[in-house]
């Protein structure tokens, strides 16, 4: 079941590799928040991210910067991962994809994320910037 948290942030951990994927993740779980996503942002700060749910894939049309994209299954298992996806691309489209995590470029490599890894969502204190 998708985690719904309209205020504050979550952090995401890679249980398979015992790494922290992201300390400050905003959840886009309404029609409008999923539609807007990262549009209008100039950058994605290291340690931050956007979890879009539900989602079977994302596009980077109109984006101003490249991002790393992680496609997640129903139980937050990694079903796809793409590094440094530039503007005007589509990624993650799959029947297996239920959620999509957008990260700063290079975060997939830093957090050692690979297909099959199990990610864990953890409540974090404080509000998202």
Q: What are the language-model segments listed below?
A:
Residues 1-129:
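Compact, glycine-rich, soluble single-domain proteins
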């Amino acid at each position: 079941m998708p985690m719904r948290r309209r205020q504050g942030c979550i952090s995401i951990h890679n249980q398979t590799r015992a790494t922290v994927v992201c300390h400050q993740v905003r959840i886009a779980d309404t029609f409008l928040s999923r539609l807007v996503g990262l549009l209008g942002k100039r950058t994605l700060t290291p340690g931050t991210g956007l979890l879009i749910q539900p989602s079977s894939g994302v596009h980077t049309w109109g984006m101003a910067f490249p991002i790393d994209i992680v496609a997640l299954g129903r139980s937050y298992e990694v079903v796809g991962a793409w590094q440094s996806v530039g503007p005007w691309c589509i990624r993650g489209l799959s029947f297996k994809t239920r959620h999509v995590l957008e990260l700063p470029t290079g975060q997939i490599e830093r957090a050692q994320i690979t297909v099959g890894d199990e990610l864990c969502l953890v409540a974090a204190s404080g509000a998202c910037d």
